[in-house]
């Protein structure tokens, strides 16, 4: 709510009601030595003056830096319709009510969101969102334990390292085993992943594109996992799904990912939303809210929160998830983003990301001593090998107003020279050319 200070007349009226002659008399019972003498605050400012100061502070904090950073969170366009529609009073809340008969508008929007996620992932059922990509991966791992009644999960080490930490933390609390399989260069080691699957394995978790930016086909891994009774979980980058084969097409049982890139701005950690989708036969093990479509006794279409017996307000400790308020406002933004672009626009956006990244790859590898570490296909993210440690180089470019990428040594010891660069549709040719020039200058100094 807005803050409207009391006028002098209102203050006098309130004091009269309680029988006090002044503010000083009101606080007289408090000993003088305990009262604040002065707050030493500057005089108030106009809205314009305050906005100018806040813009200056934002600029000092790096708001004007050109980002080539990805690693799970990406700088994408946001159509004006996303901000406009999601800020309507009917939607402007991040809370989803427990009541199955809550606002039909809210429920229909979330139902449409679920439909969009199913189309993107090639799956049959989706929930109404989770906190973020990391918790979505972890919830998928827990889901696989319930479905298979096993307690071992194989993790590809080329998935987002932060997501890996969340998964291992969740599994540790349940005394379940997490087995990490080292990558093969910048790609998943499919042979070692397959060899790691045994009769106690609940699921294999991979990411496509992975943290290094490599795109791979996991169809064979899905077949081998199913032969052993295990599930395949694929964590995906939603924008890439406009160009890359979906988890469903590859035979995955559960698809997850972070929805930040779908209409949600960069925001120092959130709030964002995570998506999770699965096959229809696993829907009762799907965590979180699920909105269903039905027909009432008058033949009218309606929407309800369905399959609620899975949830904590009914089953408590037996619930499939203890997440109660989901990220429905962020998920709504994701829906509006996808609807604004449409199928063709979404595909064009993915192609634009790919093309710009390919141009950047060619420009950056033109710098002496720089090479691409990815052996196969990449989307809008790729990993470079520099002739010197990447972290100091990134610091030099940051001083010039360019965030050059993610030095991998912080996540993968021994990869001191590796730098993962991300190029979205927002990066211009001039910005890419400047990155190449600054990189060359930094490597020569």
Swiss-Prot record:
InterPro entries per the UniProt record, alphabetical: GcvPA, GDC-P_N, GDC_P, PyrdxlP-dep_Trfase, PyrdxlP-dep_Trfase_major, PyrdxlP-dep_Trfase_small
Catalytic activity as recorded in UniProt: N(6)-[(R)-lipoyl]-L-lysyl-[glycine-cleavage complex H protein] + glycine + H(+) = N(6)-[(R)-S(8)-aminomethyldihydrolipoyl]-L-lysyl-[glycine-cleavage complex H protein] + CO2
Domain of life of the native organism: Bacteria
Residue ranges crossing the lipid bilayer per the database entry: none
Pfam annotation, one family: GDC-P
Entry annotated with the keyword Oxidoreductase: yes
CDD domains: GDC-P
Signal peptide range in chain numbering: none
GO-annotated molecular function: glycine dehydrogenase (decarboxylating) activity
Gene Ontology biological-process entries: glycine decarboxylation via glycine cleavage system; nucleoside metabolic process
KW Oxidoreductase (keyword) present: yes
EC number: 1.4.4.2
Gene3D superfamilies: Aspartate Aminotransferase, domain 1, Type I PLP-dependent aspartate aminotransferase-like (Major domain)
Keywords in alphabetical order: Oxidoreductase
Function: The glycine cleavage system catalyzes the degradation of glycine. The P protein binds the alpha-amino group of glycine through its pyridoxal phosphate cofactor; CO(2) is released and the remaining methylamine moiety is then transferred to the lipoamide cofactor of the H protein.
Family: Belongs to the GcvP family. N-terminal subunit subfamily.
Subunit structure and binding partners: The glycine cleavage system is composed of four proteins: P, T, L and H. In this organism, the P 'protein' is a heterodimer of two subunits.
Name of the protein in its database record: Probable glycine dehydrogenase (decarboxylating) subunit 1
């Amino acid at each position: 709510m807005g803050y409207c200070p009391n006028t002098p007349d209102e203050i006098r009226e309130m004091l009269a009601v309680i029988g006090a002659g002044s503010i000083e008399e009101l606080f007289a019972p408090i000993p003088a030595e305990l009262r604040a003498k002065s707050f030493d605050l500057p005089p108030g400012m106009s809205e314009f003056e305050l906005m100018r100061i806040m813009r200056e502070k934002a600029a000092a904090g790096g708001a004007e830096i050109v980002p080539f950073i990805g690693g799970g969170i990406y700088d994408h366009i946001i159509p004006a319709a996303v901000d406009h529609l999601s800020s309507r009073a009917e939607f402007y809340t991040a809370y989803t009510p427990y009541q199955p008969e809550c606002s039909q508008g809210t429920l229909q929007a979330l139902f449409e969101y679920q439909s969009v996620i199913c189309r993107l992932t090639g799956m049959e059922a989706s929930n109404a969102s989770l906190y973020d990509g990391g918790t979505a991966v972890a919830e998928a791992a827990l889901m696989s334990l319930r479905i298979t009644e096993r307690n071992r999960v194989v993790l590809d080490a080329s998935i987002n390292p932060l997501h890996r930490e969340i998964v291992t933390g969740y599994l540790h609390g349940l005394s379940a085993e997490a087995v990490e399989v080292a990558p093969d260069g910048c790609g998943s080691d499919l042979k070692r992943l397959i060899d790691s699957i045994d009769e106690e394995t609940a699921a294999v978790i991979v990411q496509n594109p992975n943290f290094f930016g490599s795109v791979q086909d996991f169809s064979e891994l899905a077949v081998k996992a199913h032969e052993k009774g295990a599930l395949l979980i694929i964590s995906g980058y939603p924008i890439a799904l406009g160009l890359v084969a979906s988890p469903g097409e590859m035979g995955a049982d559960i698809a997850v990912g972070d929805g930040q890139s779908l209409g949600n701005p960069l925001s120092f950690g959130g709030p964002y939303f995570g998506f999770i989708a699965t096959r229809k036969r696993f829907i009762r093990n799907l965590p979180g809210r699920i909105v269903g479509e039905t027909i009432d006794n008058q033949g009218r279409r309606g929407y309800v929160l369905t399959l609620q017996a899975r949830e904590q307000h009914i089953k408590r400790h037996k619930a499939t998830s203890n997440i109660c308020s989901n990220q429905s406002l962020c998920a709504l933004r994701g829906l509006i983003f996808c609807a604004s672009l449409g199928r063709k626009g979404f595909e064009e956006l993915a192609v634009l990301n790919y093309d710009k990244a390919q141009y950047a790859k060619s420009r950056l590898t033109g710098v002496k001593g720089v090479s691409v570490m990815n052996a196969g296909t990449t989307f809008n993210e790729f990993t470079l090998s520099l002739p010197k440690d990447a972290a100091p180089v990134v610091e030099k470019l940051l001083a010039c107003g360019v965030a050059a990428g993610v030095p991998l040594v912080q996540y993968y010891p021994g990869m001191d020279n590796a730098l993962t660069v991300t190029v979205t549709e927002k990066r211009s040719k001039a910005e890419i050319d400047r990155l190449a020039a600054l990189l060359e200058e930094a490597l020569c100094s």
